[in-house]
Amino acid sequence: FPRREFLIPIIGITGSNGKTMVKEWLYQLLSPEMIVTRSPRSYNSQIGVPLSVWLLNENTQIGVFEAGISKPGEMLALRDIIQPTIGVFTSLGTAHQENFPSLEAKCLEKLKLFHDTQAIVYSEDDQVLNDCISAKNYKGECLNWSAKDVHAAFFIKSIEKKDLETTVSYVWKEKVEGQYKLPFIDDASVENS
């Protein structure tokens, strides 16, 4: 399969919501500096993922691919195709819940995408997600973010919404302080930022 031919960083994104938005944001952030290959549209299914990964070429410097599942057993095949080096877990919600016995079971299935990644980015404030990551004894770097835990890798000090803009103030790894502005105010987009 063509993925093995490319020894480059590959970001794998999963979650119940926000996969496409986060993928497109990462593309916008990375593409001025790097040649990025990404999933077209919302190609995150058993058919869409292979089509997306086939887009990798000799010029690609980093790949960004979504992985979506709707039932148990689907993520292992997607993991084998994407082979991510970095993982992003956007959110854990009730989408496609009807095929899973519990939210925890769905979370554990989604986390299979990140089995061999060097790092995973996720919300520590989602207790189910945080507990599932702890239970899996994840070996990579946990780049957790939190609005509650000052010791999180990315601590959100404050979120200020004004007019149609949101300002997020943060502390990175308890050392670097900064802020960024978003051109929207809805909670889902702010959380995925």
Regions found by a protein language model. Name each.
Residues 1-125, 129-141:
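Phosphate-binding loop of NTP-binding sites
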